[in-house]
């Protein structure tokens, strides 16, 4: 039995021994959900720090202005969030193995989180392009990029809202 399964088992029996029958299931799932969120935050912080350090070094070495604007727009944070959510997606089976009916809920919750993070990543990339061309001071491209980026933001919000609804309802 792995570390997560044994820790989940300890939470399971602790709640079973210390709570009334009507509160056992909600508290077991709630505490295991807090465990999953704790793993997400720890993994996310570690990945953000690591990816930020690597991208900072890469930006300094390359002297590429576009990468510098991507670094300032914190594109690397969205990438770290995506990897953290994907890692937590793999942990669901080990943490909630005694509650198989809750798999679907937590899978949809994490998939919805991935949709939101991916939408934020797309928004940050569009902002990076806009800031890059504003810095280049190419007046015609600035106007075109601003119009395109605003259209992409509106279109992106609609598309990601639809995808989010599909993920939540399992369509």
Task: Kindly give the residue locations of the regions a language model identified.
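N-terminal membrane topogenic module
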Residues: 1-170
């Amino acid at each position: 039995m792995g570390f997560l399964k044994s820790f989940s088992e300890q939470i399971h029996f602790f709640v079973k021994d210390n709570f009334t029958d009507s509160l056992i299931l909600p508290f077991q799932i709630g505490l295991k959900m807090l465990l999953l969120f704790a793993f997400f935050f720890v993994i996310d912080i570690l990945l953000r720090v690591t990816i930020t350090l690597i991208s900072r070094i890469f930006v300094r070495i390359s002297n590429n202005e576009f990468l510098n604007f991507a670094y300032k727009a914190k594109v690397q944070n969205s990438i770290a969030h995506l990897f953290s959510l994907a890692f937590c997606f793999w942990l669901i089976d080990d943490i909630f193995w005694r509650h198989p009916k809750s798999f679907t809920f937590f899978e949809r919750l994490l998939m919805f989180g991935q949709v939101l993070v991916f939408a934020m990543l797309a928004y940050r990339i569009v902002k990076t392009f806009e800031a890059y061309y504003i810095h280049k001071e190419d007046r015609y491209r600035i106007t075109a990029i601003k119009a395109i980026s605003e259209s992409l933001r509106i279109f992106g919000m609609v598309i990601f809202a639809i995808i989010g609804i599909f993920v939540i309802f399992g369509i």
